[in-house]
C-alpha cells in the first residue's frame, strides 16, 4: 500500500491578472521557485508569481483531474473561483519568504 501525499492545485496571477494553474506536492517550495524565476517558461516570462488560490487533495488522481478541470474553464469561471475565497486578489504567499530575524517596526515613540 502506497502512502498518499497531499497535492496542491493552485492558481497564480500576475499584476495584470494573467493566470496560471498548476499542481505541486510542496506549495511553499513551488512558490519560492515561481517568485525567484527558477521555473523557466510561461510563469517566468509573464511574471505570474502571486498565489491567489489553492486547494488540497489527498489523492494524486483527484488533484490532476481538478487541475485539468480548472484549466478547461473559461477565464470568467476561474475569476469567480478565485474571488469566492480571495476577493481582494491578495498574494496568499505574502511573507512566506521574509528573512528570519528581520527587525519589526519600533514600538518607541519619538
Region locations from a protein language model:
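GIY-YIG nuclease catalytic motif and its immediate N-terminal context
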Residues: 1-40, 44-57, 61-68, 85-109
Amino acid at each position: 500500500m502506497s502512502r498518499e501525499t497531499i497535492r496542491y492545485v493552485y492558481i497564480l496571477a500576475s499584476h495584470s491578472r494573467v493566470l496560471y494553474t498548476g499542481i505541486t506536492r510542496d506549495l511553499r517550495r513551488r512558490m519560492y521557485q515561481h517568485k525567484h524565476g527558477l521555473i523557466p517558461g510561461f510563469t517566468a516570462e509573464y511574471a505570474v508569481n502571486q498565489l491567489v488560490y489553492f486547494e488540497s487533495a489527498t489523492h494524486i488522481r483527484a488533484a490532476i483531474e481538478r487541475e485539468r478541470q480548472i484549466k478547461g474553464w473559461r477565464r470568467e469561471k476561474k475569476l469567480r473561483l478565485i474571488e469566492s475565497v480571495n476577493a481582494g486578489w491578495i498574494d496568499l504567499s505574502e511573507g512566506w519568504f521574509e528573512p528570519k530575524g528581520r527587525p519589526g517596526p519600533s514600538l518607541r515613540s519619538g
